[in-house]
Amino acid sequence: METLRYRFDGQRGARAGLEHALVGVVASGNLEVLVERVPLEGAMEIEILTAARGFGAIWQAVLDDFAARHPLRDVRISINDVGATPAVVSLRLEQALEVLQGADA
């Protein structure tokens, strides 16, 4: 297992909604995403626990894209991954954010 950690400067808070959201499942080719509202001095932190070692550059690209579209403040995202593709990662991140902000995923 490999643990990756990223931190992004946030620009806006997540819309009103839940304190946390959990989407996905930990299974082959999938992942679980937990998003929590926590005081992080305006930052968004993302921690990934993955079975697929050596893909840090790909994770960085996917998360850079997500952070550019959603520059959230005071949000922690925890990802448990079992080999999900970048498209699945992006989908689950979007779903988790929708649930956190009160929309149906």
From Swiss-Prot:
Q: Which gene encodes it?
A: mdcC
Any one cellular component term from GO for this entry?
cytoplasm
Please name the InterPro entries in this protein's record: Mal_deCO2ase/Cit_lyase_ACP, Malonate_deCO2ase_dsu
**PTM comment text:** Covalently binds the prosthetic group of malonate decarboxylase.
Q: Cite the Pfam families for this sequence.
A: ACP
User: What's a Gene Ontology MF term here?
Assistant: acyl carrier activity
Name the predominant localization. cytoplasm
* O-(phosphoribosyl dephospho-coenzyme A)serine modified-residue sites: 28
Keywords annotated in UniProt: Cytoplasm, Phosphoprotein
Role, per record: Subunit of malonate decarboxylase, it is an acyl carrier protein to which acetyl and malonyl thioester residues are bound via a 2'-(5''-phosphoribosyl)-3'-dephospho-CoA prosthetic group and turn over during the catalytic mechanism.
Q: Where in the cell is it found?
A: Cytoplasm
| Protein name per its UniProtKB record | Malonate decarboxylase acyl carrier protein
Family the entry assigns: Belongs to the MdcC family.
Q: Which organism is it from?
A: Xanthomonas euvesicatoria pv. vesicatoria (strain 85-10)
